[in-house]
From Swiss-Prot:
Gene3D superfamilies: Aminomethyltransferase beta-barrel domains, Aminomethyltransferase fragment, Probable tRNA modification gtpase trme, domain 1. It comes from the Bacteria. It comes from Cronobacter sakazakii (strain ATCC BAA-894) (Enterobacter sakazakii). Keywords: Aminotransferase, Transferase. Its EC number is 2.1.2.10. Belongs to the GcvT family. The glycine cleavage system is composed of four proteins: P, T, L and H. SUPFAM superfamilies: Aminomethyltransferase beta-barrel domain, Folate-binding domain. The gene is gcvT. One of its GO terms (molecular function) is transaminase activity. One of its GO terms (cellular component) is cytosol. It catalyses: N(6)-[(R)-S(8)-aminomethyldihydrolipoyl]-L-lysyl-[protein] + (6S)-5,6,7,8-tetrahydrofolate = N(6)-[(R)-dihydrolipoyl]-L-lysyl-[protein] + (6R)-5,10-methylene-5,6,7,8-tetrahydrofolate + NH4(+). This is Aminomethyltransferase. One of its GO terms (biological process) is glycine decarboxylation via glycine cleavage system. The glycine cleavage system catalyzes the degradation of glycine.
């Protein structure tokens, strides 16, 4: 039986179409995925992301532990509340999960990990935390609501206390702050400004209904996927998994190679991959009729005249741009164009950087 978040009844009240998403009953949409998408790009929308797992790590050696566990380096986190996006790798350099880590105090860090990978993540973290004497606490007592869009912060702030407004004033992207009973972070999965707000489960339903009254549109998994794809953000299980290197998933920027003497899980494998070369993640744009979908083959001829083939990892119709976009993992050597096989048709596509929309504006040329 699929689990329900504390907002399940709110979703039904808002007219959601519910689906089983990795063992959780979650809203796919509330009537129109397209309208929800546009609300986030142009105004403010909100998502129930309580199915994600919040993990608190405590202990004197927590920073040392995370410097070993994660490919990015928490030594960069010197200001309380600062957050970091990173991969957690296996020994062969594959991605166990991508996650956000927050520096709270010197002996207290917070992780937010994906729902689909929850059990293996927790097993991996617990296994490696033990030698460091780090305690691992899963915060199932917290709900998480993402409020996203150009007007999201202003509308969310109408629910804040004076202390919460003061705590979030002038907050830069990728920070989190505990303000009374809310943990408010300037993070998201849409390419828009906004907050991800963690709160006690018993407060979530009331907070959600107040956001509705403040003019924030409830949004489901469908809009969440088209928004993150436009923003060029990876989805675990599609752009990367335990068999895919972060170097092949446009995540090279999240690997902290310096200092050279920092040993982290997967480092040796990554260094070999960097030396030998890997596939790469690119963007695809198709302005002709049709929709690019995951698993479709991408074919091109490299500069040596060799026929090469990759695969679309995620594809959709872009509501913001009005045509189809995709992310694809391809061998090195791809040029500016390629061919995608859609049923029995060979469709020409333009190859771009793996990002299509930034702050509501097209970036694809």
């Amino acid at each position: 039986m699929a689990q329900q978040t504390p907002l399940y009844e709110q979703h039904n009240l808002c007219g959601a179409r519910m689906v089983d998403f990795h063992g959780w009953m979650m809203p796919l949409h509330y009537g129109s995925q397209i309208d929800e998408h546009h609300a986030v790009r142009n105004d403010a929308g909100m998502f129930d992301v309580s199915h994600m797992t919040i993990v608190d790590l405590r202990g004197a050696r927590t920073r040392e532990f995370l410097r070993y566990l994660l490919a990015n380096d928490v030594a960069k986190l010197t200001q309380p509340g600062k957050a970091l996006y990173t991969a957690m790798l296996n020994a062969s350099g594959g991605v166990i999960d991508d996650l956000i880590v927050y520096f709270m105090t010197e002996d207290y860090f917070r992780l937010v990990v994906n729902s689909a990978t929850r059990e293996k993540d927790l097993a991996w973290i617990n296994e490696h935390a033990e030698p460091y004497g780090v305690s691992v606490t899963v915060r199932d007592d917290l709900s998480l609501i993402a409020v996203q869009g150009p007007n999201a912060k202003a509308k969310a702030a109408t629910l804040f206390t004076d202390a919460q407004r003061k705590a979030t004033e002038g907050m830069k992207p990728f920070f989190g702050v505990q303000a009374d009973d809310l943990f408010i972070a300037t993070t998201g999965y849409t390419g828009e400004a906004g907050y991800e707000i963690a709160m006690p489960n018993e407060k979530a339903a009331g907070f959600w209904s107040q956001l509705v009254e403040a003019g924030v549109k409830p949004c489901g998994l469908g809009a969440r996927d088209t928004l993150r794809l436009e923003a060029g953000m990876n989805l675990y299980g599609q752009e990367m998994d335990e068999g895919v290197s972060p170097l092949a998933a446009n995540m090279g920027w999240t690997i902290a190679w310096q200092p050279e003497d920092r040993a982290f899980i997967g480092r040796d494998a990554l260094e070999a991959q960097r030396e030998n070369g890997t596939e790469q993640l690119v963007g695809l744009v198709m302005t002709e009729k049709g929709v690019l979908r995951g698993e479709l083959p991408v074919r091109f001829t490299d500069d040596q005249g060799n026929a090469r083939e990759g695969i679309i990892t995620s594809g959709t119709f872009s509501p913001t741009l009005g045509y189809s976009i995709a992310l694809a993992r391809v061998p090195a050597g791809i040029g500016d164009t390629a061919i995608v096989q859609i049923r029995n048709r060979e469709m020409p596509v333009k190859v771009t950087k793996p990002i299509f929309v930034r702050a509501g504006k097209p970036v694809t040329q």
